[in-house]
């Protein structure tokens, strides 16, 4: 996993990500609903929140306005993402307001979440659409439970093996996505899993070039290094249309979100 290349691709896409990342936004909204549903419904129990892989801040904004925590630490691999989240309005209505202003203290910390130490005593460690980029999820889970207070919550989404299967089947390139059962097993070594589920979402596009444009503008081509020659692009588009066209002539791109909510076992 080339983390440098991943960071570079997402940094370049930060100005277009929010417009293009329709599925990721839907996933973030559902994640928040599930967190409340499976942790007792008390939005105000989460005083200290850490989000790793915050990106441009779409999920961060949901966390801020729904939970209204005292502190929100935002982390991302890309230092450039700080400019995307620095003006998030706080729960009190102003950017990065402190507790005395009735708002949330919002801080940003750049770095690889697989290597960073987050604050101990955290109530909620959470992320959307990030963990699929990790080199060693098992090691992260083994470390992350130490950052949570007893009974603290780990809540995240990732993607499963059917994610963007169209691209992988045609190019032979893609991430090695873990299936739901494997993700649940890894988490259960250190947490009590309260909720684990998956869904498959099929997005329609006018044509294969529109699919490639979508991927570029969201930055999710982070591991792809190939050069598109005219001949290779033409062959890709023809194969994509032949294999993945709908009756109405549009083509599809599949997303496979996985949702996990777990409680810290440590006492």
Task: Describe each PLM feature range.
Residues 114-125:
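A short acidic, Gly/Pro-enriched loop at the edge of an enzyme's catalytic core
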Residues 123-137:
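A short SAM/SAH-binding and catalytic strip from SAM-dependent methyltransferases
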Residues 22-46:
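Conserved alpha-helix/loop element of class I SAM-dependent methyltransferases that forms part
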């Amino acid at each position: 996993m080339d983390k440098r290349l991943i960071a570079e691709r997402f940094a370049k896409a930060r100005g277009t990500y929010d417009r293009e990342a329709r599925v990721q936004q839907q996933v973030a909204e559902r994640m928040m609903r599930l967190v409340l549903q499976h942790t007792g419904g008390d939005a105000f129990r989460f005083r200290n929140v850490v989000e790793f892989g915050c990106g441009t801040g779409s999920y961060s904004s949901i966390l801020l306005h729904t939970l209204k925590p005292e502190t929100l630490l935002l982390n991302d691999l890309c230092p450039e993402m700080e400019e995307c989240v620095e003006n998030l309005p706080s729960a009190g209505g102003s950017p990065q307001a402190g507790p005395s202003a009735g708002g949330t203290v919002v801080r940003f910390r750049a770095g690889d979440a697989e290597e960073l130490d987050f604050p101990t005593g955290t109530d909620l460690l959470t992320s959307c659409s990030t963990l699929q980029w990790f080199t060693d999820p098992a090691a992260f889970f083994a470390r992350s439970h130490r950052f949570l207070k007893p009974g603290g919550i780990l809540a995240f989404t990732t993607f499963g093996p059917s994610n963007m299967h169209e691209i992988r089947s045609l190019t032979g390139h893609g991430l090695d996505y873990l299936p739901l059962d494997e993700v649940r097993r890894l988490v259960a070594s250190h947490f009590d899993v309260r909720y684990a589920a998956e869904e498959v979402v099929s997005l329609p596009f006018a044509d294969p070039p529109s699919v490639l444009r979508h991927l570029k503008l969201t930055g999710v081509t982070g591991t792809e290094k190939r050069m598109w020659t005219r001949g290779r692009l033409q062959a890709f588009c023809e194969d994509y249309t032949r294999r993945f066209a709908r009756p109405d002539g549009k083509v599809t791109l599949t997303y496979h979100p996985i949702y996990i909510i777990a409680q810290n076992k440590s006492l």
